[in-house]
Amino acid sequence: MGSMQLKVAQQLSEPGGQVNEDLIWHGGNDFMVLDGASSLTPGSHHDAVGFVRAFTESYAVCARADKPLHTCVNESLDTLRERFDPARYEQGIGPSASLAVVRCHNGWMELLLLGDCTALILSTDGRTERTYLNEVARFDAIALDMAARIHEETGLPIRETIHNPLVHEQLVANRHMMNQPAGYRILSATTKPLTSTDVMSISLDGLAGIILHSDGFDNMEDDLTRQPIDLGRSYRMLRELERTDADLNRYPRFKIGDDATALYLEVVPA
């Protein structure tokens, strides 16, 4: 068998509200999904949108095939530190983003995940391997559990209890754990540089493709990987599930509908 490579087969990125803070980017042999989170500064006006765009622009300049993937990511972040000065943000916490990035070279792919983006690796024999960092989910669960307890105590729907001041305080505390030793790794220009990243090196031999997705598609993996793959079908199913749980009580979460982004890459001959 000759050398294999990755090709964009389908891509979808839809907002959960008025503004989409997710982004898909691909250039050459590099492909990525970003899930932005705006700062908590009053009047920030979705500053994650500018952050994820700035990162991809920087990455397009910094990334080279002869550099390790984690070096390309760190150097891209370093160029943004002056633009996203911590002094501009409440408690020094600027916008951030989860990341799933794949680089393909000579029949292999490198995969790097930060935050709560997910990779679904599809084998030609029908198996799926889900690759996901549980770091952000650990902290989100603390805030969601708090909102659920207030719901049980007061009878208010979780749609309202997630705005409780105690829950907000917990969310702020979570943000302070970005890129801390006991916290979670994520793209941020206002925290310490990333000291460690886990890069997987995976042969494309025996693979059918890979799906990168933001957490807006969490718990939708069974449909995302159902053949024939149809990201539009999965998206419609997601929004219908959300519509039937407008109070957030059945599936506790921070908003009725999150931004939902997925990138499906097929393995094809080079």
Locate each region found by the language model.
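PP2C/PPM-type serine/threonine phosphatase catalytic domain
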Residues: M1-A270
